[in-house]
Curated annotation (Swiss-Prot):
Name of the protein in question: Probable endonuclease LCL3
PROSITE patterns: TNASE_3
Main location class: mitochondrion
InterPro entries with a match to the protein in the record: SNase_OB-fold_sf, Staphylococal_nuclease_OB-fold
Keywords in alphabetical order: Calcium, Endonuclease, Hydrolase, Membrane, Metal-binding, Mitochondrion, Nuclease, Transmembrane, Transmembrane helix
Protein topology in the membrane: Single-pass membrane protein
Species name: Verticillium alfalfae (strain VaMs.102 / ATCC MYA-4576 / FGSC 10136) (Verticillium wilt of alfalfa)
Signal peptide: none
Enzyme class: hydrolase
A GO-annotated cellular component: membrane
Gene Ontology molecular function, alphabetical: endonuclease activity; metal ion binding
Length: 287
């Protein structure tokens, strides 16, 4: 007799349950957590791995090029690259003035921002500066020639040198490079601040009547200021300033002076060569 209070009146055991078949019921099979994460794209993964290497190489190259262009110090005219001319300028301190249109520059790339004058010391004294400066010639002007090799110089040569020294010696200047001349000097348009206004050094020499515009048929570097320079020269000439105060009959331009003295030197060399004493045996043969 079956138990009256059971869950079922039947004495048969319940049928065993079959395992759920997700495919039959139309459900997706269970997935692990890792399988749910997006799989990386192989090219993208390679790019991520090589990106730091690429950026490091590009950054190093950029830093090297920046150093070469802006922070490398040039110790002389011979070390300046040809691609700098007519494109770049150099900042530096004037260490000496040789005449009315030339001086020596100690290159200080980066200026005070690079520590020059407070972290990096500029050498002093001829021995410490030997081989460390750039010879600069002012573009577009020609100052009176000073005495050379025992020969007298031109009038106002000393005044021109003194004025240029007072104007730029031991001061910071910026030289806009044009070319390298036959004497390995850098021809440049030079500017300085006096005290806060930017001044063209060559132009100021012309205004004072202590230089003429450069006289040559070709190859003159003006820095785009030929008309400005010639106008300043004309004004100084009209006011009879400096060398323009010399009488017209006695005036000799720096170019004419150099041509004359160089011609005299050549004539003297020719005379000396023609009067060289003959060897004794030639004198004996020729009588």
């Amino acid at each position: 007799m079956p138990w009256p209070f059971g869950p079922s009146g039947s004495s048969e055991a319940p049928p065993p349950q079959k395992p759920r078949d997700d495919k039959v019921e139309g459900r997706e099979p269970a997935k692990s957590w890792n399988s749910l994460l997006p799989k990386p794209d192989p090219p993208l993964q390679a790019a991520k791995e090589w990106a730091p290497v690429f950026l490091t190489a590009v950054g190093s190259l950029a830093a090297f090029m920046f150093y070469q262009s802006y922070l490398r110090r040039f110790a002389g005219a011979a070390s300046i690259q040809e691609n700098f001319f007519r494109k770049r300028s150099l900042l530096g301190r004037v260490t000496s003035v040789g005449d009315g249109d030339g001086f020596h520059l100690y290159h200080t790339p980066g200026g005070k921002l690079a520590g020059w004058g407070w972290l990096r010391k500029i050498p002093e004294g001829r021995s410490n500066l030997k081989g460390e400066t750039i010879s600069i010639r002012l573009a577009g002007i020609d100052a009176p020639e000073g005495p050379h090799f025992g020969r007298p110089g031109q009038p106002f040569a000393a005044e021109a040198q003194a004025h240029l020294s007072k104007y730029i010696l031991h001061r910071r200047v910026r030289a806009h490079l044009h070319k390298r001349d036959q004497y390995n000097r850098i021809v440049a348009t030079v500017s300085t601040r006096q005290p806060f206004i930017k001044k063209d050094v060559g132009l100021e020499m012309l205004k004072q009547g202590l230089a003429t515009t450069y006289e040559a048929k070709s190859g003159v570097e003006w820095g785009g200021k030929e008309s400005i320079y010639k106008a300043a020269e004309a004004k100084a000439k009209a006011k009879k300033l400096g060398l323009w105060s010399i009488k017209a009959s006695e005036f000799e331009s720096p170019r004419d002076f150099k041509n004359r003295t160089q011609g005299n030197e050549k004539s003297e060399r020719d005379v000396e060569g023609s009067t060289v004493q003959k060897p004794w045996w030639r004198r004996w043969l020729t009588g």
